[in-house]
Amino acid sequence: MLQQRVTVIGAGLAGSEAAWQLAKRGIQVDLYEMRPVRQTPAHHTDQFAELVCSNSLRANGLQNAVGVLKEEMRTLDSLILKAADTASVPAGGALAVDRHEFAGFITEKLKNHENVTVHNEELKEIPEGIVIVATGPLTSPDLSASLKAFTGEDYLYFYDAAAPILDGDTIDRDKVYLKSRYDKGEAAYLNCPMTEEEFDVFYEELIKAEVVPLKEFEKEIYFEGCMPFEVMAERGKKTLLFGPMKPVGLEDPKTGKRPYAVVQLRQDNSAGTLYNLVGFQTHLKWGEQKRIIRLIPGLENADIVRYGVMHRNTFINSPSLLKPTYQARTRDTLFFAGQMTGVEGYVESAASGLLAGINAAKMIAGEELVVLPRETMLGSMAHYITTADGKHFQPMNANFGLVPSLEDAPKKMKKQERYERYANRALETIQQYKDL
């Protein structure tokens, strides 16, 4: 018989949620949190689930994917959502919280739970037994070394360098063409051709665009590999024309001529509903990203489902390493949760902890572990991070581009109606799992 205790490493959003899901099912939890014994550069308190950036958990309405995700989590008795609803402050259509009340609620619930033993110490290695690793983007160097030994050198990353991801339905297919450079292999990229005049306008706007200021502990990330395309642009037009926007081998089949510049879009999920901009990792402010991207032919009305980011982040190559149950492929008793798995955002991190906690509990009970349907946001997130292209894997937030298309839906359906149908389908589906 399996042991009746689970070790949860990290009391952030994911670890706190995982610990709650285990404890409420009668399972003993050893919850390890190194703060305040060892602080991170971003944390300021010893409370669990401290929100280190914004106090907003984003949109609350069901016309947004993250709003649907929240409702699914409420259905499954999420501690994080219980805390957020209790500590909410006025924020229009968003769910924002008093961050101290929010973290205090979670800390009190876990510290006072009879099935939770809190250890304020740093774990430097992955222990034996059933373990959930939820140490977040600022995982300590010693534990990072242990993770690297487990995952392998090439499967642990220390920063995000992600290009924006677009909703494929909002790309103007009349202005782009499908082609791979020099026609090698199958035609795998959508290409957005630019004239010299279009490129000049794009370039001038790009070099004027505002960037997000880097935090002190993030200053080194540009030197580790991927350079933001706005930094390339500062080196001159030709840096882009010989870099991510080079047109060689990409003649436009409509004209037979080579464009002056080309922006390539790579399919980002197996369903072909999402596309990322190749080589466009960026640190521009989000409003600027939208403005600049919409200067590209074919993308004038493109919806960005995930903005480009560059920031400090410890995460694993989940497509290579994880099952959709959040278990490691090579060790069934080891689970991962939170931003470390490649989910992006407060709510998404907590959601992964919720499923990891439920599945660790099912393992102890000798029950079949749960993989939620892709029609749910919880299921679609788990599916994405474990089936995405491992060679180009970058963290992802909740969006409707991850869920299966609607059956029998008219092609010209309005976006809001489509989203409403996605939401209704997700919430009907999650009801079947409310007694997990």
Swiss-Prot record:
Xref: InterPro entries: FAD/NAD-bd_sf, MnmG-rel, MnmG-rel_CS, MnmG_N, TrmFO
Organismal lineage: Bacteria, Bacillati, Bacillota, Bacilli, Bacillales
Gene from which this protein is expressed: trmFO
Main location as per UniProt: cytoplasm
Name of the molecule in the record: Methylenetetrahydrofolate--tRNA-(uracil-5-)-methyltransferase TrmFO
Enzyme class name: transferase
Any Gene Ontology biological process: tRNA methylation
HAMAP family: TrmFO
Any one GO MF annotation of this record: tRNA (uracil(54)-C5)-methyltransferase activity, 5,10-methylenetetrahydrofolate-dependent
Catalytic reaction annotation: uridine(54) in tRNA + (6R)-5,10-methylene-5,6,7,8-tetrahydrofolate + NADH + H(+) = 5-methyluridine(54) in tRNA + (6S)-5,6,7,8-tetrahydrofolate + NAD(+); uridine(54) in tRNA + (6R)-5,10-methylene-5,6,7,8-tetrahydrofolate + NADPH + H(+) = 5-methyluridine(54) in tRNA + (6S)-5,6,7,8-tetrahydrofolate + NADP(+)
Keywords of this entry: Cytoplasm, FAD, Flavoprotein, Methyltransferase, NAD, NADP, Transferase, tRNA processing
One Gene Ontology CC term in the entry: cytosol
Annotated compartments: Cytoplasm
Enzyme Commission number(s) of this protein: 2.1.1.74
Residues annotated to bind FAD: G10, A11, G12, L13, A14, G15
Cofactor(s) listed: FAD
Family the UniProt entry places it in: Belongs to the MnmG family. TrmFO subfamily.
